Amino acid sequence: MVDLQPDEVAAVLKQQLAHLKTDTELEEVGTVLQVGDGVAHIYGLTKIQAGELVEFENGKKAIALNLEENSVGAVIFGDAEGIGEGSTAKRTKRIASIHVGEGMIGRVVNTLGEPIDGKGPIKGELYEMPLERKAPGVLYRQPVAEPLQTGIKAIDAMIPIGRGQRELIIGDRQTGKTTLAIDTILNQRTYFEQGNPVYCIYVAIGQKASTIASVMASLEKYGAMEYTTIVAAPAATAASLQYFAPFTGATIGEYFRDTGKPALVIYDDLSKQAVAYREVSLLLRRPPGREAYPGDVFYLHSRLLERAAKINANDDIAQQMNDLPPSLEGKVKGGGSLTALPIIETQNGDVSAYIPTNVISITDGQIFLESALFNAGIRPAINVGISVSRVGGAAQVKAMKKVAGTLKLDQAQFRELEAFSKFGSDLDVATQRTIDRGRKNQEILKQGLHHPLTLEEQVCILYASTNGYLDKISLSQVTEFEKSYLSLLKSQHKGVLAKIAAGEWSDGIAQVLAEEAKNLAQLYVNDTSINS
């Protein structure tokens, strides 16, 4: 028999005990009382927080929205398969969050930030950020001062948008709302090529999967997916995922905003999000209000849209921002921005309905698209009279301000006079001239699908239009004149175009544009007189 030395035994025991973990961890576990329609009522989670994630025994997750006296109402992310009465659910002690990073650029993700485009997992460094977060306080913001060029003449000239602004796109179905948003994303290609990208996030809420696929195909065709992320919550997904999809988009945008970069988020559309929220609220037995929406539907949209902001350029101030996620510590930079373009669908042009009026009052202006204009072939079908940008004027570049200063007023006046002229009364020469110029301006402001124009192209053509160089040419020749004029300037005056692109404006630039417009217009007038 081998002699055992006491010190050897002690050494072996010490070695074994060194790896022994005696810490006990308490898990708060509840029992599902009832489940149905994507909502689970759980008993036993007495210390749970509002908005906390709950995990079921099969790994599926839900978010606690209703904290009642004897139970918790939790909305399940996705379907409720495998969850039944008596199933266990445990607290995660984590607020709903997603993992965000630059690897998301060019990807299609779902509401939970998981890739759904079949290209494998998201690569690169990822940061955990909460879906719900307080908007930056007043101290950490600065006024909107930098333009966000949409590439759409009617918007950049009359309803300018600045970086950090919230501008509503509102109109009936099939009036070109999504097209307007997609064209804005396509126009950011210029900045991407210059090395100063505006990162775009397109959030599709409650749309057909085929529509989302079509949007993605358009973005890929024009090379816009290189700086764009799509968050997809199609019509077939659960109401809970449609409700949270805009918050996912805002969180991705906030990552770029807080790291000092410009971002643009498009919510297409918030009407469907409100419907999804109404469904969730009614299933949770919350008392319905106007149009059966819950009482806090205004707060739903205000807390989402307030997250769009232009952040103070001072790094030290930006780093003290309220509610910064711990994962971004040491990475926060000032000067970033998040611009929001929410979309709202109206019924028969009724902008005074509940959800439209709510969102109009939250945003910094609205672009109203009209069915009558769209059907008349005026596209984009923007009603200039009731469209407005409350803060974007401060961000408009000098050259655009100079050429389009009175355009909005002139077009509103033209619409009024045109309506009056339909009564058939004799019009004086001045009124006829105003109507004629208004029609030509209207023709100039028309734009083709997925055909955004650069700043310098817009300034040049609007200068010719607003200064009367199109007065003598016929309405049918306006589009042809525009193409010829821009082609001429690109071939013979590249230096002038470069100055306008940099935001410069001078009498010398105006003189070059005036001479070329006058000479070209004369050719069209002579051509018309010869043919007649």
Swiss-Prot record:
Gene3D superfamilies: 2.40.30.20, ATP synthase alpha/beta chain, C-terminal domain (1.20.150.20), P-loop containing nucleotide triphosphate hydrolases (3.40.50.300). ATP binds at G171, D172, R173, Q174, T175, G176, K177, T178. Its EC number is 7.1.2.2. This is ATP synthase subunit alpha. PANTHER family: ATP SYNTHASE SUBUNIT ALPHA, MITOCHONDRIAL. The lineage of its organism: Bacteria, Pseudomonadati, Bacteroidota, Cytophagia, Cytophagales. HAMAP family: ATP_synth_alpha_bact. It is a peripheral membrane protein. It is found in: Cell membrane. It is an enzyme of class 7 (translocase). Coiled coil: none annotated. Keywords: ATP synthesis, ATP-binding, Cell membrane, CF(1), Hydrogen ion transport, Ion transport, Membrane, Nucleotide-binding, Translocase, Transport. It comes from Amoebophilus asiaticus (strain 5a2).
